[in-house]
């Protein structure tokens, strides 16, 4: 395997040389013997900031590939007492050894095991699950391996089922009914969190989002793991419901499982999806700490993008409602000229943009008020 040295953040690692694995002039990271995707640098950059605030004693990266994520945590975030890196690919495990040594890390434990098998053997304060595709196969084992009040982090790149494009796949993987709706970018994240909560409950545990976001082609979630059947039951009863959208007028709301399914505005039957998580997507105290801290990481290649994301999330996080997609709402209302988002925000007064969609707004004001602004500004 021919290697190439790359720099990401403050570390230098060896990765398979992309030139050796091109097909007809194109390269996909999955074609190489060991997976390394430079397009996920933004994900790793933000994760470095999160881990720097958590300062876990033990960090476990269960699907390490080149080891880049765990190595960056140790070098840039926090020199944990123990760094555990694992990959079931023996070629990857050997490359991790090289990269750990190349970055002067002496206390790393490197495993060449199936991720689930390893997770049922050891416990950790921070566990990272960054798979190629869905994290579902690793939910039970990773939540089980996370100590009380520890953190588990998931990346999900299978947006097709989560956003409703592949309904049968969503039912199979996430045990949720799904359709492609106006706010599916956010609803997909909520379906993912809902699935994790239900899986954790079988272990008499539960999870609460610490920080989460959508970017490019994936969701990223950092969640606090709590123990206790009562806490698991409380979270399910309070924060797992369904979501309804009216296909005629665009009205949307969270609904109970056995509620009436007709739109209160126009009487059309709702399109119902779920179950999904309806609670806050971020811990506000932790979000404030992130905003107060991220400037310390101005060396990151995606620093400006991180700044923009956090600025938007800070504003939208206070609203409880799912965002409205103004472009799609205007289409349902037969409004040909979509008003500028900034004008709608000014009209509403108490509202914000959302990081989920450029034409989305988030507000706790009623549907009628949103419609009034959209129509008055056309």
Swiss-Prot record:
Reactions catalysed according to its record: guanosine(26) in tRNA + 2 S-adenosyl-L-methionine = N(2)-dimethylguanosine(26) in tRNA + 2 S-adenosyl-L-homocysteine + 2 H(+)
GO BP: tRNA N2-guanine methylation
InterPro entries attached to this UniProt entry: SAM-dependent_MTases_sf, Trm1, TRM1_arc_bac, tRNA_met_Trm1_C
Binding positions (S-adenosyl-L-methionine): 44, 69, 87, 114-115
Family label: Belongs to the class I-like SAM-binding methyltransferase superfamily. Trm1 family.
Protein task: Dimethylates a single guanine residue at position 26 of a number of tRNAs using S-adenosyl-L-methionine as donor of the methyl groups.
Protein name, per record: tRNA (guanine(26)-N(2))-dimethyltransferase
């Amino acid at each position: 395997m021919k290697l190439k040295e790359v720099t990401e953040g403050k570390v230098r690692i060896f990765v398979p040389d992309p030139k050796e694995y091109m097909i007809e002039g194109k390269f996909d990271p999955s074609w190489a013997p060991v997976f390394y995707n430079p397009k996920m640098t933004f994900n790793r950059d933000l994760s470095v900031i999160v881990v720097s605030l958590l300062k876990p004693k033990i960090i476990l990266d269960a699907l390490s590939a080149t080891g880049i994520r765990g190595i960056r945590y140790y070098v840039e975030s926090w020199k944990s007492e123990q760094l555990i890196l694992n990959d079931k690919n023996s070629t990857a495990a050997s490359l991790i050894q090289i990269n750990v040594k190349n970055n002067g890390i002496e206390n790393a434990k490197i495993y060449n095991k199936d991720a689930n098998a390893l997770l049922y053997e050891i416990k950790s304060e921070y566990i990272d699950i960054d798979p190629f595709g869905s994290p579902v196969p690793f939910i039970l084992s990773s939540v089980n391996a996370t100590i009380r009040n520890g953190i588990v982090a998931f990346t999900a790149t299978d947006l097709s089922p989560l956003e409703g494009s592949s309904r049968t796949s969503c039912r199979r993987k996430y045990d949720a009914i799904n359709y492609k709706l106006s706010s599916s970018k956010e609803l997909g994240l909520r379906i993912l969190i809902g699935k994790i909560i239900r899986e954790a409950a079988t272990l008499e545990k539960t999870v609460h989002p610490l920080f989460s976001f959508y970017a490019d082609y994936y969701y990223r979630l950092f969640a606090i793991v709590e123990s206790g059947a009562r806490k698991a039951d409380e979270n399910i009863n309070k924060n797992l419901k369904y979501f309804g959208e009216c296909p005629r007028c665009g009205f949307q709301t969270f609904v109970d499982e056995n509620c009436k399914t007709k739109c209160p505005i126009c009487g059309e039957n709702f399109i119902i999806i779920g179950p999904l998580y309806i609670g806050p997507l971020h811990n506000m105290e932790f979000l404030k700490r992130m905003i107060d801290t991220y400037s310390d990481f101005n060396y990151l290649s995606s620093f400006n993008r991180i700044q923009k994301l956090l600025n938007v999330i800070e504003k939208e996080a206070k609203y409880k409602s799912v965002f409205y997609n103004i472009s799609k709402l205007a289409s349902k209302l037969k409004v040909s000229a979509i008003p500028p988002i900034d004008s709608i925000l000014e009209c509403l007064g108490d509202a914000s943009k959302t990081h989920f969609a450029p034409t989305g707004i988030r507000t706790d004001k009623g549907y009628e008020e949103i419609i009034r602004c959209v129509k008055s500004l056309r």
